[in-house]
UniProtKB/Swiss-Prot annotation:
<dbReference type="InterPro" id="IPR029063">
    <property type="entry name" value="SAM-dependent_MTases_sf"/>
</dbReference>
<keyword id="KW-0489">Methyltransferase</keyword>
<dbReference type="GO" id="GO:0016430">
    <property type="term" value="F:tRNA (adenine-N6)-methyltransferase activity"/>
</dbReference>
<dbReference type="GO" id="GO:0005737">
    <property type="term" value="C:cytoplasm"/>
</dbReference>
<dbReference type="InterPro" id="IPR050210">
    <property type="entry name" value="tRNA_Adenine-N(6)_MTase"/>
</dbReference>
<dbReference type="InterPro" id="IPR002052">
    <property type="entry name" value="DNA_methylase_N6_adenine_CS"/>
</dbReference>
<dbReference type="Pfam" id="PF05175">
    <property type="entry name" value="MTS"/>
</dbReference>
<comment type="similarity">
    <text>Belongs to the methyltransferase superfamily. tRNA (adenine-N(6)-)-methyltransferase family.</text>
</comment>
<keyword id="KW-0963">Cytoplasm</keyword>
<keyword id="KW-0949">S-adenosyl-L-methionine</keyword>
<dbReference type="GO" id="GO:0008033">
    <property type="term" value="P:tRNA processing"/>
</dbReference>
<protein>
    <recommendedName>
        <fullName>tRNA1(Val) (adenine(37)-N6)-methyltransferase</fullName>
        <ecNumber>2.1.1.223</ecNumber>
    </recommendedName>
</protein>
<dbReference type="GO" id="GO:0000179">
    <property type="term" value="F:rRNA (adenine-N6,N6-)-dimethyltransferase activity"/>
</dbReference>
<dbReference type="InterPro" id="IPR022882">
    <property type="entry name" value="tRNA_adenine-N6_MeTrfase"/>
</dbReference>
<comment type="function">
    <text>Specifically methylates the adenine in position 37 of tRNA(1)(Val) (anticodon cmo5UAC).</text>
</comment>
<dbReference type="InterPro" id="IPR007848">
    <property type="entry name" value="Small_mtfrase_dom"/>
</dbReference>
<dbReference type="InterPro" id="IPR020596">
    <property type="entry name" value="rRNA_Ade_Mease_Trfase_CS"/>
</dbReference>
C-alpha cells in the first residue's frame, strides 16, 4: 500500500511491517532535534528514517535484513528529497554492529527502533510479517546489547512497545547498561488503559549527571467522537495531509 505524507511518500508493498500508527507515533515523538548521527534499526519501508530526516539534520543509517523491505526502503529513500542524508545497509543489526564496532566508526547519538515484540505463540503464516513482529528474529536481550554498543556515551534511543511486552523488556533493561529516562503511555481514549508505550533509553553512566527520575506522561489518541485529540494532532500535524 502507498502512503503520501506532507513531505514524502511511502510504498510499503510486501513489507512485513507496513506503515502503522505505532511507527508514526514513534517517528513524531522521538526527541530528534539535536540528532547528528542517527541509526534506524529494522528500517522496514523507511518510515522512521524519513520522518527523522524531516525532523532533523542528522545523517541517517538504516539497517534492514529482509530483502523485500530493503528494496522498498531503497526506493522510498531515492524518491525523497533527503537522499543525500540517508544510507541503507542490507544486514542484520547484529552483523552491522559487529562490522561497525570493528573499526573507528563513530557511535550514534540517536537510535530509533520499532522492535519485534511477540514472543512464542502462533506466528503469522506470512513469513515477512512474522519476522517483523516476533522476537525470534531479534530478542530484547540482543537488541539491548546492540544499542549499548552502538549508542554514543550521551546518546538516546527511542522505542515503542505494546503493554504486554513492557514487563519482560524492562526486566532486560534492568540487567543491561541502559536505563529508561522518559516514558509516554498511549491510550486509544481517555476511558481506556494504555496499550502502547513510547520511551527513551540512555547509558546508565548518564545517571550520575542527570536526575534519575523517569519523566512520565500520557497521550490519548482519540476523543469520544473518534476524532484525534489536540495532543495527537500536535504530534502528527507535520506529517498527515489532513492536518
Amino acid at each position: 500500500m502507498a502512503f503520501t505524507f506532507k513531505q514524502f511518500h511511502i510504498d510499503d508493498h510486501g513489507c512485513g511491517m507496513p506503515v502503522s500508527t505505532d511507527g508514526v507515533l514513534l517517528g513524531a515523538w522521538a526527541p530528534l532535534s539535536k540528532a547528528e548521527n542517527l541509526l534506524d534499526i529494522g528500517a522496514g519501508s523507511g518510515l522512521l528514517s524519513l520522518m527523522a530526516a524531516q525532523r532533523s539534520e542528522a545523517q541517517i543509517t538504516a539497517v534492514e535484513l529482509d530483502d523485500t523491505a530493503f528494496h522498498a526502503c531503497n526506493k522510498n529513500f531515492i524518491a525523497s528529497k533527503w537522499q543525500s542524508r540517508l544510507n541503507l545497509v542490507y544486514a542484520s543489526v547484529q552483523e552491522f554492529c559487529n562490522q561497525h564496532t570493528d573499526g573507528n566508526n563513530a557511535q550514534f547519538d540517536h537510535i530509533i527502533c520499532n522492535p519485534p515484540y511477540f514472543k512464542g505463540g502462533t506466528q503469522s503464516s506470512n513469513r515477512l510479517r512474522a519476522q517483523a513482529r516476533h522476537t525470534d528474529s531479534l530478542t530484547f536481550h540482543a537488541l539491548l546489547e546492540v544499542i549499548t554498543k552502538l549508542l554514543a556515551a550521551t546518546g538516546t534511543a527511542s522505542l515503542i512497545l505494546p503493554s504486554q511486552s513492557m514487563t519482560p523488556f524492562i526486566e532486560e533493561v534492568e540487567k543491561s547498561e541502559l536505563w529508561m529516562n522518559q516514558l509516554t503511555n498511549i491510550s486509544d481514549s481517555r476511558f481506556k488503559a494504555p496499550h502502547r508505550h513510547l520511551f527513551t533509553l540512555k547509558h546508565k553512566a548518564t545517571k550520575l549527571a542527570e536526575d534519575d527520575t523517569v519523566i512520565t506522561n500520557n497521550l490519548c489518541i482519540k476523543e469520544p467522537d473518534a476524532s484525534y485529540t489536540p495532543e495527537m494532532i500536535a504530534l502528527i500535524t507535520g506529517f498527515y495531509l489532513k492536518y
